[in-house]
Amino acid sequence: MGQKVHPLGFRLGITKSHSSFWYVERRHYASFVKEDIVIRNFMNKELLETLISLIKIERIYEFSEQRNNTIVYIHVARPERVIGRDGQGLSRIRDILIDRMNYLLGKTPRIITCKVVGVTSPNLDARLLADSVRRELEKRTPFIRAMKTVMLQAMKAGAEGIKVQVSGRLNGIEIARTEWFREGRVPLHTLRADIDYFNDIAHTIYGVLGIKVWVYKV
């Protein structure tokens, strides 16, 4: 059997970059990874309705003062919902995040800055397209219609190709199966090809459905 490689990890350093960017002493490494997990889980839950595309974390660790300066870049399709009036929404989220981290990880000198980045082409973003399929499946929309809709949106937005795969008890049938559709080209083995990928889970009354989306962008 052929083994599949994660499309994003396969292209790190070529067309993709790491979503966490920092360096720290070995004894602090585990605590920084925990902080990353807490930040991502909090943002994905708190900002669910803002259509998050990507969360990037950068750190500048000051060894002399043992202080952690963290910058969180939140890429969303609806930035106005995050920022709020006069930036109050963003400040509230940052304060809640600091309280959550102090509660779960203990109080340490940390400075967190949140910056919002708007997504210019949401219909070419694999995560946003997968989120759209998930919402439709949870509304009990037929899976073929949900898949074809996002594929049409992506191709109209200028994608070179898109592949969407859904697996599980499709339309509530007893036996689980996998269905996929592809439009255009999706060259997974070409390293210089800009492939965006995301996998998501839809919770339905029949069980869990797995969703995978590949988008080939020029």
Curated annotation (Swiss-Prot):
**Annotated GO biological process:** translation
Domain (KH type-2): residue spans on this chain: 39-120
Q: Could you tell me which PROSITE patterns the record lists for this protein?
A: KH_TYPE_2, RIBOSOMAL_S3
Q: Which Pfam families match?
A: KH_2 (PF07650), Ribosomal_S3_C (PF00189)
SUPFAM superfamilies, alphabetically? Prokaryotic type KH domain (KH-domain type II), Ribosomal protein S3 C-terminal domain
One GO MF term: structural constituent of ribosome
Q: Is Transmembrane helix set as a keyword in this record? A: no
| Gene3D superfamilies linked | 3.30.300.20, Ribosomal protein S3, C-terminal domain
Q: Where in the cell is it found?
A: Plastid, Chloroplast
InterPro entries for this protein: KH_dom-like_a/b, KH_dom_type_2, KH_sf_prok-type, Ribosomal_S3_C_sf, Ribosomal_uS3_bac-typ, Ribosomal_uS3_C, Ribosomal_uS3_CS
A Gene Ontology cellular component where this protein is annotated is: chloroplast
- Keywords for the protein's UniProt record, in alphabetical order: Chloroplast, Plastid, Ribonucleoprotein, Ribosomal protein, RNA-binding, rRNA-binding
Write the signal peptide boundaries. Answer: none
Assembly and oligomerization: Part of the 30S ribosomal subunit.
The text of the family note is: Belongs to the universal ribosomal protein uS3 family.
The protein's name is Small ribosomal subunit protein uS3c
